Amino acid sequence: MKTLGQFIVEKQAEYPNAKGELSGILSSIRLVAKVIHRDINKAGLTNNIIGTSGAENVQGETQMKLDLFAHNTMKQALISREEVAGFASEEEENFVAFDTERGRNAKYVILTDPLDGSSNIDVNVAVGTIFSIYRRVSPIGTPVTLADFMQPGNRQVAAGYIVYGSSTMLVYTTGNGVNGFTYDPSLGVFCLSHENIQIPANGKIYSINEGQYLKFPQGVKKYIKYCQEEDKATHRPYTSRYIGSLVSDFHRNMLKGGIYIYPSATNYPNGKLRLLYEGNPMAFLAEQAGGMASDGYQRILDIQPTELHQRVPLFLGSKEMVEKAQDFMKTFG
């Protein structure tokens, strides 16, 4: 069976001018996945990573101990790479410039949600790590600037996630399809288990927090009712499945077919998920697997960011389902 390391080397060989920089970054992320996997598997045995840290992130959300552990693990792994010029995280207010000679001469910046769904960790529900990689736009040889991180998602060079569930999987794209690798803890390696993943064009699963129904826009309410109606021709009603972890919900829907929705609401008028740390990387993966990602009106990957922690409504998954939901939004608002 092909390992992630072998796969990365093979793909690099397809580009004669490649210098292995992106491969090196992916290797560091592979190491991060192993470290976080190890500590998540001990979550019930120690209090060091379970519970709240007593601090809040820039969005005013309570940070879990494991949020900070995952954030620091990712940050330290990337600082050691000569290919990375800077780093931005959902857990940190400002971006971090790796202002060393190596960092100033590096070509790439990384954005990450270090631990998606971390509030689920103490009840043993799957969580994940999301990452996004861009080529910097500021001059090589200088420290990175905010502009390096404020690029639309269509300029990503790679994106992916790690899901820590019944098994740990690393799923990523470099713009040439989506591949998934399952961690074998007995060997300490990720093995290619899901090659060239394709999202079914349609599905029977919709994933949304229906407890917030009264706060949703009319278009979302109408779409939920559409999903619940009985219609044999379109195989409705659909099944509602919502874990509360973007990575876990999207991973299931990508393999089985479905739509994930985190819309705007009266308490989150701009949506709750972050464009740069969650929306863009998941949208890149969805499109590379044949799916679609929208804010209800436009393509996620075409949105020009205006803030580092900008929020966005997210409709993500099977192409036909996202198109239908978008039709409801455009009709009913």
From Swiss-Prot:
Keywords: Carbohydrate metabolism, Cytoplasm, Hydrolase, Magnesium, Metal-binding
Molecular function terms from GO: fructose 1,6-bisphosphate 1-phosphatase activity; magnesium ion binding
InterPro entries: FBPase_C_dom (IPR044015), FBPase_class-1 (IPR000146), FBPase_N (IPR033391), FBPtase (IPR028343), Fructose_bisphosphatase_AS (IPR020548)
GO cellular component: cytosol
Binding site for Mg(2+) 2: 113, 116, 278
Binding site for substrate: 116-119, 209, 242, 272
SUPFAM superfamilies per UniProt: Carbohydrate phosphatase
Residues that, per the record, bind Mg(2+) 1: 90, 113, 115
Superkingdom in the source lineage: Bacteria
Residues passing through the membrane, by range: none
Keyword Ribonucleoprotein: no
BP GO terms, sorted: fructose 1,6-bisphosphate metabolic process; fructose 6-phosphate metabolic process; fructose metabolic process; gluconeogenesis; sucrose biosynthetic process
Matches recorded under Pfam families: FBPase, FBPase_C
Disulphide bridges: none
Catalysed reaction, written as an equation: beta-D-fructose 1,6-bisphosphate + H2O = beta-D-fructose 6-phosphate + phosphate
Top-rank EC class of the record's enzyme: hydrolase
Name of this chain's protein: Fructose-1,6-bisphosphatase class 1
Organism: Pasteurella multocida (strain Pm70)
